[in-house]
Amino acid sequence: MLVSIITPFFNEEQTLAILLERVAAAALPAGMTREFVLVDDGSRDGSNAIAAEFVGRHPDAARLLSLPSNQGKGAAMRRGMSAAKGDIILIQDADLEWDPADYARLLAPYVDPAVSVVFGSRLLGHEAKRIYYHYYLGGRMLSAWTNLLFGSHVTDEPTGMKSFRRGVLDGITLGADGFDFDPELVARLLQAGHTIHEIPVRYQPRTFKEGKKVRPRDGLRALWVLLQIRLQGKQRRA
């Protein structure tokens, strides 16, 4: 079973090289192999060169895709997903907040063919680390809002460690360009009837000085996206 690890990045030269080495070294469950799909979202620093050097060392397993300008996480993810060849898609942000050492546990549930979506949760089994308390509260609010709207039981809706079988994309359309990609993905998956399984993962938050990009307004936008999709109802395919 092939796992496509998609890493969108924008100006992450301080963390990208370390992250990619950790992704390459991370253990996977027996019977799983990996491909690296790196998507440069218009970086203006040395990130592209770092990614290109990594691809040069892993030519059979890694690809670098580049957007002509900074278009946002959602645009980068759609580009990466369209190129991915794996049976499972795994989203790995480039900021070192999410530990690839958790891959084995994140992917283990896929031995059950009935499991289609697995997220990593910061709130299961570990004391959630936090630097900005309002982000912690915002995450709890987003999770509660998601559960209210869709009848789900997620504990960490805004988690940056998401995975799903490639086939789930056949029934949904994603159009968000920015960080609203995440709530859009969650809402569409739940709306399509998929159960989101969660496993505990580690989390090392970074500060704005260290390059954190998500802002409080993105949380407010996420609340609206979730509600908007709930009100729209299920997508219909022609």
Language-model segments: residues:
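Catalytic donor-sugar/metal-binding loop of nucleotide-sugar-dependent glycosyltransferases
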Residues: 153, 174-177, 186-204
